[in-house]
Amino acid sequence: MLRKHLLFLSLAVVGLAGCNQHSASLLPRREDGVAAGEIGSRLPDFSAEDLRGHKISSVDLHGKVVLIDFWATWCQPCKKEMPGYQKLVDKYGSRGFAVVGLKFDTMRDVEDPIRFAEKLGVRYPLAIATDDVKQKFGGIEGLPTTLLYDRQGILRKKVIGFEYTDVIESELRPLL
């Protein structure tokens, strides 16, 4: 009888140990095994409606260096980063650099996102990050999350949390 209990307990422990791997195994993977949202992964196919009702699509970003910024109006580090990203667009947009801000929608906004962006001087496209869009980027672990893709659509830099604009710019310049 003790042997049966030990066998059952052993199987239960082994079974539960494998449960922790669900998040990584559910992420979309390329043929080469790179999980979505990880360095070396490709810019996913996505489309969204921006805050003013215009369509944003990954198709429009092909051949450009792209910075995807996941943000929220309640996120203080986001408020610090976004004006710097606008300055990068102003400086490098004519050289094929684009920024798309994807608004994380987990909490009720205390501020209208359009007015929020206007106060910060942000003019690059801003859209709502639906659950589907977040999943295509591999899930979002924290805000802000910044993803920098090269012209071939390969993820070259990923930052979860605040990053200084000059650090992003130093990573951006060689990709242009």
Regions picked out by a protein language model, each given a short descriptive name:
Residues K79-L120, A129-K136:
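Structural microenvironment flanking redox-active thiols in thiol-disulfide oxidoreductases
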